[in-house]
């Protein structure tokens, strides 16, 4: 609960794992458990979270149900089939959490989320209805032409790398999904298109997204070091 309203989490785990060398990233083993089990554990154990909607690829529905049962993730109230686009998957999850006043959207392939990010994200979202986790960029970023030539160097001090969770008042993110007809790489982008403010709160460099086998190795190291 947060401000006397139910809090739901959409865990998006319907990606295609194209860069994982043939293994499904959400079921890859990380310190003896599937990546997805690590992710769900953070939300299951969070006192702020009431309900979880898990979104997976259609071919993973059975495995996801078995995982939820095996680890007794009692807060998972729905296991939904994802769509062609990430937005379709999130939309399915939002529908399942229709009685929640606040919603966190998190990548299922980010298993090392610090639990404090959940209350911190909710507090940040309280200010304007939307908030996203982010970290400062470490590398120099350049804009290039279609031919691969550098056009300009972007001011790093004005740029951030956005992560999940992304936290929203439920009515705001539902409105964004209903009204904005664009393809977005994250949920906050849809809210931005409504000309609504989005607050930034501190993410963590350890909150990596498992995309390649190298990411999985790094996650093992971070987990053994306690992040």
UniProtKB/Swiss-Prot annotation:
The record marks 19, 25 as: Transition state stabilizer. Keywords: Isoprene biosynthesis, Nucleotidyltransferase, Transferase. The record marks 156, 209 as: Positions MEP for the nucleophilic attack. CDD domains: CDP-ME_synthetase. It catalyses: 2-C-methyl-D-erythritol 4-phosphate + CTP + H(+) = 4-CDP-2-C-methyl-D-erythritol + diphosphate. Pathway: Isoprenoid biosynthesis; isopentenyl diphosphate biosynthesis via DXP pathway; isopentenyl diphosphate from 1-deoxy-D-xylulose 5-phosphate: step 2/6. This is 2-C-methyl-D-erythritol 4-phosphate cytidylyltransferase. It comes from Dehalococcoides mccartyi (strain ATCC BAA-2266 / KCTC 15142 / 195) (Dehalococcoides ethenogenes (strain 195)).
């Amino acid at each position: 609960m947060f401000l006397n309203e139910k809090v739901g989490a959409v865990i998006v785990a319907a990606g295609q794992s194209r860069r994982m060398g043939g293994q499904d990233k959400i079921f890859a083993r990380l310190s003896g458990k599937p990546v997805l089990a690590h992710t769900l554990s953070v939300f299951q154990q969070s006192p702020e979270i009431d309900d979880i909607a898990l979104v997976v690829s259609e071919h993973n529905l059975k495995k996801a149900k078995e995982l939820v049962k095996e680890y007794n993730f009692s807060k998972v109230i729905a296991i939904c089939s994802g769509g062609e686009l990430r937005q379709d998957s999130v939309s399915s999850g939002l529908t399942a959490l229709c009685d929640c006043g606040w919603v966190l959207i998190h990548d299922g392939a980010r298993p090392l989320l610090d639990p404090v990010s959940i209350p911190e994200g909710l507090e940040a979202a309280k200010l304007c209805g939307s908030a996203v986790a982010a970290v400062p960029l470490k590398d120099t970023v350049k804009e290039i032409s279609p031919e691969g030539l550098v056009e300009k160097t972007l001011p790093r001090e004005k740029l951030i790398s956005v992560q999940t969770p992304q936290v929203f008042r439920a009515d705001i993110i539902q409105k964004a999904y209903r009204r904005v007809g664009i393809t977005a790489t994250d949920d906050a982008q849809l809210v931005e298109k409504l000309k609504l403010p989005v607050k930034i709160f501190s993410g963590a460099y350890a909150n990596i997204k498992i995309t390649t086998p190298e990411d999985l190795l790094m996650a093992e190291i971070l987990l053994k070091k306690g992040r």
